[in-house]
Curated annotation (Swiss-Prot):
Protein name per the record: Proton-coupled folate transporter
GO terms of biological process kind: folate import across plasma membrane; folate transmembrane transport; folic acid metabolic process; folic acid transport; heme metabolic process; intestinal folate absorption; intracellular iron ion homeostasis; proton transmembrane transport
Modified residues (N-acetylmethionine): 1
Effect upon mutating residue 156 to G: 2-fold reduction of methotrexate uptake
Effect of residue 376 to Q: In HFM; abolishes folate uptake
SUPFAM superfamilies from the UniProt entry: MFS general substrate transporter
Species name: Homo sapiens (Human)
Reaction(s) catalysed by this chain's protein: folate(in) + H(+)(in) = folate(out) + H(+)(out); (6S)-5-methyl-5,6,7,8-tetrahydrofolate(in) + H(+)(in) = (6S)-5-methyl-5,6,7,8-tetrahydrofolate(out) + H(+)(out); methotrexate(in) + H(+)(in) = methotrexate(out) + H(+)(out); pemetrexed(in) + H(+)(in) = pemetrexed(out) + H(+)(out)
Residues reported in the UniProt entry to bind H(+): 156, 185, 281
Keyword Membrane: yes
Expression sites by tissue: Expressed at highest level in the upper half of the small intestine (duodenum and jejunum), expression decreases downwardly in the subsequent quarter and is undetectable in the last quarter (the lowest ileum). Also expressed in kidney, liver, placenta, spleen, retina and retinal pigment epithelium. Lower levels found in testis. Very low levels in brain, lung, stomach, heart and muscle.
Residues on Extracellular side: 45-82, 136-140, 204-208, 290-302, 352-355, 415-422
Length: 459
């Protein structure tokens, strides 16, 4: 009976014929995040120094005079401009990515994961190319916004993550899914840690241009890997139209269409939980470099590199902790522990005035990144196998909305609180993290095994 149905579909599975080898998705995510993390803090520092030069602020990182410039209005103007242009880049990326990532993610449920991975890789490549031109030719910083928009148009990093997590869901069982999600996120963290260590030292030695050129080269390699080496995980990819409202409708139906195999309440509340977690994560990340550059810390590029590496270390420590804690605790309670440490780290950041205290805050985040793989796995188990792309494109949309919200709140709040408490945004982040802590605990207590109903083989 199945034999008569399969032959018509096999000729449509054309992408497999073009593959040189069936590689996993993790190298793609590793290369993408290495390039992005290499560019991120450097872009912030580049904006800082460009605005400093434009406004005639000498802004050196000399330790002796740093604390005496805390009330310098020119320095505060540099901080404000840097923060605002970071916001403009994120808003531009969100407005375009809101449409493209949801469209492309649901489209991947039909055509396969590789087309989205290739498009998203090309977008990241274009963004890096624009950044190289800005740095090399001293173009207006507004071109950073243009590069961000071009990247978002082709799916952005969120689209690449949507396809990557969907491909993991395609090939993993419900028993192993949480750990596989954490493993994918760990590859993000290792890449970020290495890029952070390299970026700070390289900037001090050779300036801004060479790190951006390396990011461009890595993204070229990533695009080639996505096109010719990634092993398609969708069983029967088939041709379908890209520009149709059916793709967006499939995402809406995840949350509004009643079905016996899923709980719309759980989908909505877990989506809210991951929205808040990502908002705090990216909001803090957006202002951390600026917080460290300015008084009283006055970090140089080397220390910023160490700090950014410490920020990515929890991807590894969280992976190991998740594997160990799963032997004695349910996933939800592991996430609760991670949230508790995340809150502690944010509170320490808020009151950090010396370098050792900042690194203490980073140390407290060692379990903070068990949260998102747990929530992603729970969401994945609530939908059918044929809805994984739509689900993770919805999560990518939530991710984009969270990043915009983070930029709007943290990048606007940070300059507004410079005069009375620079660390206030971190306290706000700690308070916001109480929301997912309550939601996850409430859902686990109310119906702890609901997510396994699609996967009876799991305990």
């Amino acid at each position: 009976m199945e034999g008569s149905a399969s032959p018509p579909e096999k000729p449509r599975a054309r992408p497999a014929a073009a593959v040189l080898c069936r590689g996993p998705v993790e190298p793609l995510v590793f290369l993408a995040n290495f390039a992005l993390v290499l560019q991120g803090p450097l872009t912030t520092q580049y904006l800082w120094h460009r605005f400093s030069a434009d406004l005639g602020y000498n802004g050196t990182r000399q330790r002796g005079g740093c604390s005496n410039r805390s009330a310098d209005p020119t320095m505060q103007e540099v901080e404000t401009l840097t923060s605002h242009w970071t916001l403009y880049m994120n808003v531009g990326g969100f407005l375009v990515g809101l449409f493209s990532s949801t469209l492309l993610g649901a489209w991947s449920d039909s055509v396969g994961r590789r087309p989205l991975l290739v498009l998203a890789s090309l977008g990241l490549l274009l963004q890096a190319l624009v950044s190289v031109f800005v740095v090399q030719l001293q173009l207006h910083v507004g071109y950073f916004v243009l590069g961000r928009i071009l990247c978002a148009l082709l799916g952005d990093f969120g689209g690449l993550l949507a396809a990557s997590f969907a491909s993991v869901a395609d090939v993993s069982s419900s028993r192993s899914r949480t750990f596989r999600m954490a493993l994918l996120e760990a590859s993000i963290g290792v890449a970020g840690m290495l890029a952070s260590l390299l970026g700070g030292h390289w900037l001090r030695a050779q300036g801004y241009a060479n790190p951006f050129w390396l990011a461009l080269a890595l993204l070229i390699a990533m695009t080639l890997y996505a096109a010719f080496c990634f092993g398609e995980t969708l069983k029967e990819p088939k041709s379908t139209r890209l520009f149709t409202f059916r793709h967006h409708r499939s995402i809406v139906q995840l949350y509004v269409a009643p079905a016996p195999e899923k709980s719309r309440k759980h989908l909505a509340l877990y989506s809210l939980a991951i929205f808040v977690v990502i908002t705090v994560h990216f909001g803090a990340q957006d202002i951390l470099t600026l917080y460290e550059l300015s008084t009283p810390l006055c970090w140089d590029s080397k220390l910023i590199g160490y700090g950014s590496a410490a920020q990515h270390l929890p991807y590894l420590t969280s992976l190991l902790a998740l594997k160990l804690l799963q032997y004695c605790l349910a996933d939800a309670w592991v996430a609760e522990i991670g949230l508790a440490f995340n809150i502690l780290g944010m509170v320490v950041f808020a009151f950090a005035t010396i370098t050792p205290l900042m690194f203490t805050g980073y140390g407290l985040l060692f379990l903070s990144l068990v949260i998102t793989p747990v929530i992603r796995a729970k969401l994945s188990k609530l939908v059918r196998e044929t809805e994984q792309g739509a689900l993770f494109s919805a999560v990518a949309c939530v991710n984009s909305l969270a990043m915009l919200t983070a930029s709007g709140i943290f990048n606007s709040l940070y300059p507004a609180t410079l005069n009375f408490m620079k660390g206030f945004p971190f306290l706000l982040g700690a308070g916001l993290l109480l929301i997912p802590a309550v939601l996850i605990g409430m859902l686990e207590k109310a119906d702890p095994h609901l997510e396994f109903q699609q996967f009876p083989q799991s305990p």
